[in-house]
From Swiss-Prot:
It comes from Arabidopsis thaliana (Mouse-ear cress). Disruption phenotype: Abnormal root hair development (e.g. shorter with abnormal shapes). The double mutant scyl2a scyl2b has short root hairs and small shoots. This is SCY1-like protein 2 B. InterPro entries: ARM-like, ARM-type_fold, CIK-Related_Protein, Kinase-like_dom_sf, Prot_kinase_dom. CDD domains: PK_SCY1_like.
Amino acid sequence: MSINMKTFTQALARTAAVIEKTVHTTVQEVTGPKALQDYELLDQIGSAGPGLAWKLYAAKARDSTRPQQYPTVCVWMLDKRALSEARVRANLSKAAEDAFLDLIRADAGKLVRLRHPGVVHVVQALDENKNAMALVTEPLFASVANALGNVENVGNVPKDLKSMEMSLLEVKHGLLQISETLNFLHNNANLIHRAISPENVLITSAGSWKLAGFGFAISAAQAGNLDNMQSFHYSEYDVEDSILPVQPSLNYTAPELMRSKSPSAGASSDIFSFGCLAYHLVARKPLFDCNNNVKMYMNTLNYITNESFSSIPSELVSDLQRMLSTNESFRPTALDFTGSNFFRSDARLRALRFLDHLLERDNMQKSEFLKALSDMWKDFDSRVLRYKVLPPLCAELRNLVLQPIILPMVLTIAQSQDRTDFELITLPALVPVLSTASGDTLLLLVKHADLITNKTDSEHLVSHVLPLLLRAYNDNDVRIQEEVLKRSTSVAKQLDGQVVRQAILPRVHGLALKTTVAAVRVNALLCLAELVQTLDKPAAIEILETIQRCTAVDRSAPTLMCTLAVANAILKQYGVEFTAEHVLTLMMPLLTAQQLNVQQFAKYMLFVKDILRKIEEKRGVTVNDSGVPEVKPHSAANGLQFQSSTQIPEKVASAAKSSPAWDEDWGSPSKDSAVGNPASSRHNTNDQFNKSTDQSQPSIMSTLPNKTTAPTTCPAVDIEWPPRQSSSLTAPATDNQTQLNTGTSFASGFDELDPFANWPPRPNNGASVASTGLKNGAASNFSNNLPGGTHFQTANNDNWAFSSASLSSLKPPQQGNQGISANNQDPLNSFGVPKQSQGMPSFTSGSYNNQKPADISSIFGSSKTEPSAMKLAPPPSIAMGRGRGRGRGGTGTSTSKPSGSQPSLLDLL
């Protein structure tokens, strides 16, 4: 049997078609209609169509690489399964469901074929499967029914829709747009809509009002043929058929469409429906509310009175009464209604109409209009600004001639936008302007940099706003430089730290150093002060270097006060130590600037004193006005507790020295064990710490030679040295050796051991001082437990000589002053050195090397015996056994005694 190839080929083709259809059906059942495959649904925005059966979803394309006409679209979804379940609950027939679905298909088909700005634009035609139907249109906001409060079939009502309040101006503009669309349908498309109602009027995302719901539309030819014309039949009782409405809503239907004998339909029928819609929008309530009951409808229609129009503006009443007339011939055309005083008397509406056709005007007309709009736009409400004014202005930003006029209005209106609307509507129009702005346009954008920054994400900030600021830094216009410096901090807070250090910070430094305008430098320094909190320490040091270079040439008061602001910011960010090390060295020379007034100087001093106070608090030492440090209470090493009022000098000298100190051959006897000195025995142990000596100064006696020769011309001086007898004195274990038990400094305990404290010089001028030795060669052992726990013994078998060089090098004290006060007053001045005004000898290392020996014979020249003689400063520190000569301002609390009550004197040879 032969095979017919033609028949075989046809059979294969039919099989392939069946397979393809089966695969397509299977895919649709799994993935849904084509709209769901190409677009990703976002949130439901509303509902529309007959009975609000359509669910409206905002959506975006899944394939972002393909060019799209709209960044977002609106997907109309109708769930067949939910519709079927609702039909069963309402006890309706399957025929009613099929009739309703046919109505939906007819509506979508006519909507695709109609192309007009007043008709909803279809992006993707209707597609359906067994479970759903889907249609893709331009982005929408909601239906007018949703805007009037009917949110049936809306799951989660959007925030904007829930709080929506349409102003009368928006209603006027919407009605004017619908009337123009009706004029197109009647005169150009030759269509009669027959179902104009809030459910079939859509508001786009741009704020325009457009028509949909053409399921009941017929051509003008069909309307004139009464044989083919079918009337709508409504019951004489209340019927709730909103689930599957197969007829237009009776509340907006013309009466002639309900006549069963001679029904007629024409353009006037749409005018009546349009009048009902206008009444509902303006009066905020429907004219007819009859629940599809024809009797109630006719009663309301026959008894319409003037009171029914009491809430309608007077300029609209006459036109509205004509539109709602039962006589079709009395009704105006759609074109006639556009000329109503209700529209033409409103200047704001005329402005919106001009904006609708702005792209069609020339630059001269645009310029005149925009100048008038600059004073008028403040009267618009937020919704009108957002949906009616802003979109055409953003589109016109491409016109470089009109940019300086349009941009201020755009930026001001953008302040009322949320972040999403700004990124979708305003930012795309601003991006080309941001990249090319210069002059006044650049200045304006920099002033509104905070607005753009707060309404964009970091990606747009780096790609669009940051290049704008960098161009502003490099611009020569002083106004632009000032503004960009003022806005730098707020922008820097939202940028990465590395971007700030690499892009913004160097340009701020450059403006601070290169500018010759005081305002720019001040703003640059203030910007640096605000940026300190986001920078690290090396960057802060660079800021200080810039300030140092600025203040070297500019010490004006504004610059200096900005410097203080930077210093305060650094102190707050990095603390006292960093500020003391790097900032004080910069601030101190500025205190002498004569440009600072009293208040400004006080602020500078307050800052410096605050730093010093914090350093004192951190060290635990407070220096009073007299220069004496007050140490906070703390426990000593041996467990003794010092009083808070104890004033001690700072200990600097170390006990662990390689060579013995000048006073290591003197012990420090305890006050409690001292014998023969009643004055010193009245003081307690804490008095050892009340001596005013400056141990922070190095010993100035170390420059003297170890051995000196006795003078031959100096008159003899009787020196008495009463060694204090104590029951606790014992012979030393070894001679010429000092044993130190602890490393604590013991210099503060020598104030009680001054061998020259109580000797009254005798008027014996015939002898010369050659040498001094211990009487009878007796060795004394002094022991004392110092506050730091120091215990030492000294063998004083060695003799010590009072050389002429040491005596002649001492400056004579003033005879009118006492060496030390009886009440242990502090002999140190505020700088911690011995007070020269109290008769203390002043020692400097240079005085021993460079000055001539001073004649001190006048001190002892008086033949008059005095009960309390003037003290003589001790010899240099390097001579063994020469007492205390470390430049201290005073000795212990011992007072001089009459010679009769003292022990035998030293032999002065």
